[in-house]
Amino acid sequence: MREPEGGSAAPPVRYHVGDLAVARIAARRARTVPGVVTLRADLSQTLLGLAGTWLSPDPVPAELRAEGVAVAVRGDRADVRVTVVTELGHNCRDLAATVQHEVGAAVRETTGLDADVRVTIADIELP
């Protein structure tokens, strides 16, 4: 690490990444995993979404939505819960492992936070 002129080291960087920012990163990456049809919001997210739609006339673009992802950032860790819908023909265990890996990597790469990612397969779409 390079020291600034004058011989003193730079102070450590202090920052906080909000829950919504992490949720959007996680949702965006989870949607790209082959076999993920959609993300599914839980009841609390559905109710908040309805309230937000009623209160805000401007809809949130699809790529910025975080439905189906719940996040709690605590210090340098993010607890991430992702709820996905898949389609028949994909192995649920393999899909969950891939989503877990991809979302964790995206959160680490983008925010610097360690992520504990839990995946729920909520439904399987039939042809």
Which functions belong to the PLM regions below?
Residues G104-R108:
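Short amphipathic alpha-helical signal-transduction/dimerization elements
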Residues M1-C92, T98, E109, L113-P127:
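Contiguous, often N-terminal, cationic amphipathic patches that form binding interfaces
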Residues V99-V103:
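A short beta-strand micro-motif common to beta-rich folds, especially ectodomain repeats
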